[in-house]
From Swiss-Prot:
It is found in: Cell inner membrane. InterPro entries: CysT_permease, MetI-like, MetI-like_sf, Sulph_transpt2. Part of the ABC transporter complex CysAWTP (TC 3.A.1.6.1) involved in sulfate/thiosulfate import. Probably responsible for the translocation of the substrate across the membrane. This is Sulfate transport system permease protein CysT. The chain crosses the membrane at residues 17-37, 64-84, 99-119, 136-156, 188-205, 215-235, 243-263. PANTHER family: SULFATE TRANSPORT SYSTEM PERMEASE PROTEIN (PTHR30406), SULFATE TRANSPORT SYSTEM PERMEASE PROTEIN CYST (PTHR30406:SF10). Residues 60-263 form the ABC transmembrane type-1 domain. The gene is cysU. One of its GO terms (cellular component) is plasma membrane. Keywords: Cell inner membrane, Cell membrane, Membrane, Sulfate transport, Transmembrane, Transmembrane helix, Transport. It is a multi-pass membrane protein. It comes from Salmonella typhimurium (strain LT2 / SGSC1412 / ATCC 700720). It comes from the Bacteria. The complex is composed of two ATP-binding proteins (CysA), two transmembrane proteins (CysT and CysW) and a solute-binding protein (CysP).
């Protein structure tokens, strides 16, 4: 009996596994271990004093509020942009699709400088919003704008492949059975999109938690008002207070990991429920 040799795209299992583990150790575990080593230099009382400092707590609140608003905005308009790019054909569609990746390619400092110019009192958007007594620069709203700009591609690029795979024929079939467009979207499209949409919003939120370059230009560094956690960490590093910087960072890291774990659990349960039906 002839032995059938299986062809693999990657080299041998041992080499592939070893390379993967090396990558995980160097890129993921090593930075985390450095963070833990810095935290080990602090007692629990010192750690608690740092993370519960009133100014640090205020930075947590501003960061979480702005990231939440930005992620909700991205969830709505990211879904809308993915829908337009997938369901419609129009002149300039390819250019618009390419522009969706601009926040990834644009340096965050350049993005922050551009947003600060547009939303300043004399800027194009700033002058318009001033008529409604809305100020964006040097407020938490400016932080949310910067976060939304830098993280909206996560939603668009997560939802877009699912929409392309789903196709419009499912909506058309629902409409031929008497469903309205809203009903077909809510009962046919949205259940299929929900896992990808939730994942995109979660990625947008976690990305926003660590935003620094764009935020500093549009919101500045006003104590108790526009300070974000990434800026607090930077200030502690400038003071060579590495344990305190690590303590502040550990709270955001824990929040991000908890969110990602919750989203993965929710997605798996949602997937099992859909398959069960």
């Amino acid at each position: 009996m002839l032995a059938v040799s299986s062809r693999r795209v990657l080299p041998g299992f041992t080499l592939s596994l070893g390379t993967s583990l090396l990558f995980v150790c160097l890129i993921l575990l090593l930075p985390l271990s450095a963070l833990v080593m810095q935290l080990s230099q602090m007692s629990w009382a010192q750690y608690w004093d740092v993370v519960t400092n009133p100014q640090v707590v205020a930075a947590y609140k501003v960061t979480l509020l702005a990231a939440f608003v930005a992620s909700i905005f991205n969830g709505v308009f990211g879904l809308l942009m993915a829908w337009i790019l997938t369901r419609y054909r129009f002149p300039g569609r390819t250019l618009l699709d390419a522009l969706m990746d601009l926040p990834f390619a644009l340096p965050t400092a350049v993005a922050g400088l551009t947003l600060a110019s547009l939303f300043s009192v004399n800027g194009f958007y700033g002058q318009f919003l001033a008529q409604f007594d809305i100020k964006v620069t040097y407020t938490w709203l400016g932080i949310a704008v910067a976060m939304a700009f830098t993280s909206i591609p996560f939603v668009v690029r997560t939802v877009q492949p699912v929409l392309e795979e789903l196709g419009p024929e499912y909506e058309e079939a629902a409409q031929t059975l008497g469903a309205t467009r809203l009903q077909s979207f809510r009962k046919v499209v949205l259940p299929e999109l929900s896992p990808a949409l939730i994942a995109g919003v979660a990625l947008s939120f976690t990305r926003s938690l660590g935003e620094f370059g764009a935020v500093i230009f549009i919101a500045g560094n006003i104590a108790w008002k526009t300070e974000v956690t990434s800026l607090m960490i930077f200030v502690r590093l400038q003071e060579f207070d590495y344990p305190a910087a690590s303590a502040i960072a550990s709270v955001i890291l824990a929040a991000s990991l908890l969110l990602l774990f919750s989203i993965n659990t929710l997605q798996s349960r949602f997937g099992r429920r859909v398959v069960g039906h």
